[in-house]
Every structure is written in structure tokens, then in C-alpha cells.
Amino acid sequence: MKKNILIFGLVSGVFLAAFVLSISFLSKVFHGHLDNEVVGYSAMIIAFSFIFVGTRNFRDKYNQGMVTFGQAFLVGLGISLIGSSLYVGSWLIEFYCFMPDYMDKYSAALIQKAQQSHLSPETLQKRLDSINSMSSMYKNPVMVVLFTYMEVLPVGIVISLISALILKRKPRTGATDYANNNVSY
């Protein structure tokens, strides 16, 4: 099970890392008009499709065609953690080496958007305080790691749950008992 988790986690993580490292290039090509959320979550879903493949591979090749919901979920969770960790690591490289002003630009864009919206003064002030709080928290590397995991890991967990529900397969006790002549009349 560990080898299966490692292989499919690395495949998923390499895909996510390649996406993260290419996002600054894509933003420059599209002159900032790239909807990063849609593209980002689409890339996460594609990368985490390896959770389904890895869980099915574990069930069919290593577990005699059977897997419980719990086993399938643990396989998916392991793949998610490895893939998410590579995503976080690549974001840290991108952020600290190539985009150290990312949070300043992102906060400025959020503030401008909030000021252009038609919010009441109280709501606007709450939004601005929230943006400034997030920006100051992002100065701490631990918070950068936590925020980045919170961005990617929930997607992996949801896909792990869905994969476990679809792929769970318990042995049929009646059929195996009859086939092994263990049936009592």
C-alpha cells in the first residue's frame, strides 16, 4: 500500500508542482487576465484524479480486488498528502524566489476591488481589516504553509472520499463460502 501511495502521490504532486511553477509564466502571457482560481482548481482536480487511479490500482493489483471504504480513504488521503506537500513546496519556492511581492499585489487588488464595490462603510472597513490581517499573517512562513495546505488539501480529501465511496468492494461471503465448499446445510 505504501509503494502505491508514494508512486501516485508523487505523480499527482509533480503535476501540481509543474502547475504552480508555470502559473507566473501563464499570468504574464495572459497579462494578468487569467482566472487563477478556475485554472488552479481545475489543475487540482486533474492532479487528484490520480487518487482514483491509485486507489483502484491498490484494490485490483495488491488487495485481491477488494477494498473497504476505510482502506480506500486512507490510500486517497496518503496520495493527497504527498501531492499537497509537493504543491506547498513548489509554492514556497515560487513565492520566496520569484514572487516575493505576490501578497502585496494580491492585497492591493483585493482592496481596490472592495473599494469599487458598493458596500456600506462598516462592511467595507471589515473587508479591509480582513485583507490587511491576511496580508500580515502571510509574512510568517508557517502561515504561508498552512494557507497553502488549506487551499489544496480539502480538494484532495473530497476526491479521496468520492473515490473511496465509488471503489469500495467487500468480499461476498456467501459466494466465497459456496466456492470453498464451506456451506453448511
What are these regions (language model features)?
Residues 3, 7-11, 15, 74-83, ...:
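Alpha-helical transmembrane segments of multi-pass membrane proteins
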Residues 15-23, 47-51, 83-87, 91, ...:
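Alpha-helical transmembrane segments of multipass membrane proteins
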Residues 1-58:
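Transmembrane alpha-helical insertion/packing segments
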Residues 55-71:
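Membrane-helix interface/capping segments
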Residues 131-154:
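Individual transmembrane alpha-helix segments
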Residues 113-139:
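Short membrane-interface loop/juxtamembrane segments of multi-pass integral membrane proteins
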Residues 161-185:
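Juxtamembrane interface at the cytosolic side of transmembrane helices
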Residues 89-117:
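Functional transmembrane-helix hotspots
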